[in-house]
Amino acid sequence: MSPEIALNRISPMLSPFISSVVRNGKVGLDATNCLRITDLKSGCTSLTPGPNCDRFKLHIPYAGESLKWDIIFNAQYPELPPDFIFGEDAEFLPDPSALHNLASWNPSDPECLLLVVKELVQQYHQFQCSRLRESSRLMFEYQTLLEEPQYGENMEIYAGKKNNWTGEFSARFLLKLPVDFSNIPTYLLKDVNEDPGEDVALLSVSFEDTEATQVYPKLYLSPRIEHALGGSSALHIPAFPGGGCLIDYVPQVCHLLTNKVQYVIQGYHKRREYIAAFLSHFGTGVVEYDAEGFTKLTLLLMWKDFCFLVHIDLPLFFPRDQPTLTFQSVYHFTNSGQLYSQAQKNYPYSPRWDGNEMAKRAKAYFKTFVPQFQEAAFANGKL
């Protein structure tokens, strides 16, 4: 159900509270998921004119789970705070004295419900952390992370239900990784969606038993960061080592991700240097180039009255990954009506060369390769 449809069914006096929750409500580490409501119902009599829904189920993203809490207002007394039912978490009994925004409920503040939900989620986190005491191993993992502020202050924990047969229970740690994304080139962060939210990397680590014999890590990147780093398949985190600890494993993943970000930033500056060198060496032979991301360059060149194009595609992780050179005849066509072309990646190249050296080496390579390309174009293409 879309937020607008849901809000149209809410009692008008309660609508500001719920609007603040579904339109602006982001609670916890997962900035890509908003709060949402379902199961709208009314406690009013059938004679009460609508819209009159005053109770609903609130879905809250937390540690990879979706908490489902019932929130019950009374449309007849909209100035009163709501009641809460915590669904499957019957053992969760929040401390009323710590719910300051509930105790001092201000019906004139549209955000008062959202503020109470945030306080409840904080207490829910403490409740989940306390459940780890049943496992010395999981408690060790938690306490060692807690000693590091960069991890301890950005962590959510969900302890699963006990297995009735074994007495074991699972646990999931969700951590917001302290990786700086601020220097990623802006062109890579565009056009993902209209409201991308915070740029964030979350590491989820699931312990399927209390002795950590089955541990499954997974990395989640916000949409813009995933796009900037080359897509979901571009980054593979290592398996959790047997006998390993989170306090050792999490920094490894941070280091891996930081290096990936640095590769992207370095690639952008190196591509710009590369294209600047080609502009200098080939001058009027440059037909066009990508002036934003510096990922493409096209040259129009001549060798003994034979004109040809060279399309240069620079990869995201340049200079580590070698550019592709595509030679294209301006005279000859394939059977499908396309200009005859050949792509080359087997040419002299070193990622250690600067842009000027790469341009000089490319110019020398063009002179050696063009004769055989011309011969192939005449042999395989059609005028």
From Swiss-Prot:
Phosphoserine found at: S2
GO CC terms, sorted: BRCA1-A complex; BRISC complex; cytoplasm; nucleus
Subcellular location: Cytoplasm; Nucleus
Record PTM N-acetylmethionine, positions in chain: M1
UEV-like 2 as annotated region, ranges: 275-364
GO molecular function, one term: polyubiquitin modification-dependent protein binding
InterPro entries on file: BRE
Organism superkingdom: Eukaryota
Keyword check for Acetylation: yes
Record-linked Pfam families: BRE
Subunit note: Component of the ARISC complex, at least composed of UIMC1/RAP80, ABRAXAS1, BRCC3/BRCC36, BABAM2 and BABAM1/NBA1. Component of the BRCA1-A complex, at least composed of BRCA1, BARD1, UIMC1/RAP80, ABRAXAS1, BRCC3/BRCC36, BABAM2 and BABAM1/NBA1. In the BRCA1-A complex, interacts directly with ABRAXAS1, BRCC3/BRCC36 and BABAM1/NBA1. Binds polyubiquitin. Component of the BRISC complex, at least composed of ABRAXAS2, BRCC3/BRCC36, BABAM2 and BABAM1/NBA1. Identified in a complex with SHMT2 and the other subunits of the BRISC complex.
Similarity field: Belongs to the BABAM2 family.
Free-text comment on this protein's domains from its UniProt entry: Contains 2 ubiquitin-conjugating enzyme family-like (UEV-like) regions. These regions lack the critical Cys residues required for ubiquitination but retain the ability to bind ubiquitin.
Protein's name in the database: BRISC and BRCA1-A complex member 2
